[in-house]
Amino acid sequence: WEETIIYSCLQKVMGKLYAAEDSLGGKCLESAAACLGDFMFFAGKPCKELVMRKPDGYVIMVPQTEEWASVIKDCFLGTARQITRYAMRKDTVFHEERLKRMIKELPREYRLQPIDEELYDQCIAYEWSRDLVSGFESKAAYMKYGLGVVITKNGEIVSGASSYSIYRDGIEIEVDTREDERRKSLAAVCCAELI
């Protein structure tokens, strides 16, 4: 199952792995969950007990199979809703000149900046931008391992692209733009700079 969040957990870079306990209190390696940020991926033999160990708050549960999906629905009758998560093609061919041109065309009222400690705090402060950095366990962890850029306008973050998760061979990117600044290609500029 090729998912960057799972790679992050398996490689012990970030996130956590959970296994179900068997009837004797030992680990049951037939069922596992990878948990990072808002996501929890389930694999192996479907296990109700593992699903019920979800962290507090909002969680996007990703089943590997229809059997896992059924267990999740049964555990959270009336409170869970099914959505479709679209995977992006993992293409590593970029047109460098086009990316540079996009960055150069950013209007003057905007400023493109790498995420530093002050901008990290600003990302965390707003719900729309929190996921740019919140996958990391702390500010120190983001500063050490994270990679991201934001666009500011009048000192406030209006768009950003950042590593939601990292693993040895790459990153999964989180991209967000404040609602009143959307449809201006700001997210594309952030992505171009991050790449």
Model feature map: region roles:
Residues 5-8, 12-118:
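Acyl-donor-binding surface of acyltransferase catalytic domains
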Residues 101, 135-138, 192:
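Tryptophan-centric aromatic hotspots in well-structured domains and transmembrane helices
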Residues 2-14, 127-148:
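Active-site rim helix/loop that mediates acceptor-substrate recognition in acyltransferases
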Residues 183-195:
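Conserved acetyl-CoA-binding loop-helix of GNAT-fold acetyltransferases
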Residues 114-134:
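Helix-loop element at the rim of GNAT/NAT acetyltransferase active sites that forms part
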Residues 138-178:
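A conserved beta-strand-loop-helix scaffold within acyl/acetyltransferase catalytic domains
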Residues 40-43, 170-172, 184-186:
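A short, polar/proline- and glycine-enriched secondary-structure boundary/capping micro-motif
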